[in-house]
Amino acid sequence: MSRSKKTRRISDIMPARKADKKPALPISNSKKRKPTRYELDVQAREEKKKRKHKGLPTGSRNVITEQKTASAKVKKDPRVGSRKKVPLMVEFVNKPEKGQMIKPVPLEPSNHATKATVSPEVELTQLENNECLNQLLDQLEAGKVLSTQDQQFVDECLDRVHELIIELGIEDDEENNEDLLLRQFETIDINKFK
């Protein structure tokens, strides 16, 4: 047989108390009669309930801040900010606006004359000590393929080096030494060393 849980109601055990019922507040005239002890207790309980629930409801801080942020979004100053588009690339910045043209400045021919006044010896040492050129030559020796611009730069620099060598009359000592050693090797009589 299944068990059934017994339940009790409060009214079964004891009758309702006077404190559980909300009594109607009797109208007391202070002149006619003095309030009874029971009326004073009821009045004191009601005042205590009012004092107990004096504070703000829970979470009121969050509600207030949400209301403030919502009102802040609505009240936006139209003068703040600019409607002018900001260019994202440099080339757009350098373009003149409509009707505003910048006159080009003519190049002075004296700049070319100063470059020509550099002595060939100085120019040759500059080319030999050029770090960019040396790095590109190292990459070529390592077997890497250069871009077209880099290859063109290397070719121009090497051509200029050859021109300066011819102009200065510098001969490649390495090539002459190799030729001399080769001739010497070919003409050596091996029988002398026996």
From Swiss-Prot:
Q: Which GO terms describe its biological process?
A: ribosome biogenesis
Q: Which GO terms describe its molecular function?
A: GTPase activator activity
Q: So which domain of life are we looking at? A: Bacteria
- Entry keywords, A to Z: GTPase activation, Ribosome biogenesis
Provide the transmembrane region boundaries: none
Residue ranges, annotated region (Disordered): 1-81
Stretches of Basic and acidic residues bias are at 9-23, 36-47
In what ranges is there compositional bias, type Polar residues? 59-70
Q: State whether it acts alone or in a complex, and with which partners, per the record.
A: Interacts with Der.
Protein purpose: A GTPase-activating protein (GAP) that modifies Der/EngA GTPase function. May play a role in ribosome biogenesis.
Q: Which family does it belong to?
A: Belongs to the YihI family.
- Which protein is depicted? Der GTPase-activating protein YihI
